[in-house]
């Protein structure tokens, strides 16, 4: 089969590699679509420490079951359409045993630490596969993984009925978070982004107001602030807009060495709550349901998928901010 092989940071090729066979407890999936996300860019640039090289990246994917190991007892017949949770937890560390699987001390992930889905086929644990409703195509199925991350983020925030929200970043994750906020009953949601086309999409998806800069909102205060940019200065800026008793969700991934200027006195005196959100925690099945029911619609975010041979072009479009969400269709 053909696959993207990243030999070292900055150097990838489309290569012929052996077809995978299902190991114990595994299925083989023909990849229908695999999304490119910020983590893939970090892996390409050598900025994701857990990643070994060479590796085939790709962790946001959906496809068709083509082979099933004999010991698999789940209802995953050949021909079934599935989305795959890429998370690989050990199940025995202190955090896994306390229900915090996403903080596993031995964390691994398909496409991040073991070869993933920028390939025609991939072998995965059967327990990571989620059946898709028949009307969900490959691209929509590949959006389940990022939506599952967003669902976990909002669960971390807690109840938000009627609360005013400012959300920074109208990329893929920001626009999924926006839809979830609206669907969950948040009060008016204001979205901030520098790209006019993305703000237009945000308005169509339910934003009550859009702004091109945090400066436009400097005299306002919000009960909830959500950052989906991962830019430290933006995190500081949006935190400054919190009202007393406000809650901040740091969702975007900042550089590890970045710090915040949020005053400890303000956290104390204004009872500010700062919350992080790491990947997925038992939110994959709810994400399947949200897309399958039509409650969340990722289609306004999607560009036409590109073939494996155009992986480099897809990366260029992601890096230069063209479109919102790009997928590779290897098969």
Where is each model-derived feature located?
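N-terminal glycine-rich cofactor-binding segment
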Residues: 3-21, 38-67, 83-84, 101-115
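NAD(P)H dinucleotide-binding glycine-rich loop of Rossmann-like/cofactor-binding domains
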Residues: 88-168
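A short acidic, Gly/Pro-enriched loop at the edge of an enzyme's catalytic core
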Residues: 217-225
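Glycine-rich phosphate-binding loop and adjacent beta-alpha segment
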Residues: 232-293, 330-331
């Amino acid at each position: 089969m053909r696959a993207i092989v990243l030999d070292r940071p900055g150097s990838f090729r489309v290569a012929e590699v052996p077809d995978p066979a299902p190991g114990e407890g595994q299925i083989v999936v023909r990849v229908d679509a695999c999304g490119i996300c910020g983590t893939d860019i970090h892996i390409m640039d050598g900025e994701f420490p857990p990643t070994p090289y060479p590796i085939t990246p790709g962790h946001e994917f959906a496809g068709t079951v083509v082979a099933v190991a004999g010991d698999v007892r789940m209802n995953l017949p050949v021909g079934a359409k599935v989305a795959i949770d890429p998370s690989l937890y050990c199940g025995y560390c202190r955090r896994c045993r306390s229900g915090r699987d996403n903080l596993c001390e031995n964390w691994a992930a398909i496409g991040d630490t073991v070869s993933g889905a920028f390939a025609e086929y991939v072998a995965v644990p059967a327990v990571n596969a989620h059946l898709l409703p028949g009307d969900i195509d490959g691209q929509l199925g590949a959006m389940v993984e990022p939506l599952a991350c967003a669902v976990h983020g909002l669960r971390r925030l807690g109840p938000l009925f009627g609360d005013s929200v400012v959300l920074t970043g109208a990329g893929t994750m920001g626009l999924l978070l926006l839809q979830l906020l609206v669907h969950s009953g948040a009060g008016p949601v204001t979205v901030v982004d520098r790209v006019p086309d993305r703000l237009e999409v945000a308005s169509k998806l339910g934003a009550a107001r859009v702004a091109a800069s945090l400066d436009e909102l400097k005299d306002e205060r919000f009960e909830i602030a959500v950052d989906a940019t991962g830019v430290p200065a933006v995190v500081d800026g949006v935190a400054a807009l919190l009202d007393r008793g406000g809650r901040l969700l740091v969702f975007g991934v900042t550089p590890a060495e970045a710090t915040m200027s949020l005053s400890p006195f303000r956290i104390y005196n204004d009872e500010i709550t700062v919350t992080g959100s790491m990947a997925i925690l038992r939110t994959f099945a709810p994400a399947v349901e949200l897309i399958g029911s039509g409650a969340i619609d990722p289609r306004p975010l999607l560009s036409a998928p590109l073939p494996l041979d155009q992986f480099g072009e897809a990366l260029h479009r992601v890096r230069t901010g063209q479109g919102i969400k790009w997928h590779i269709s290897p098969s």
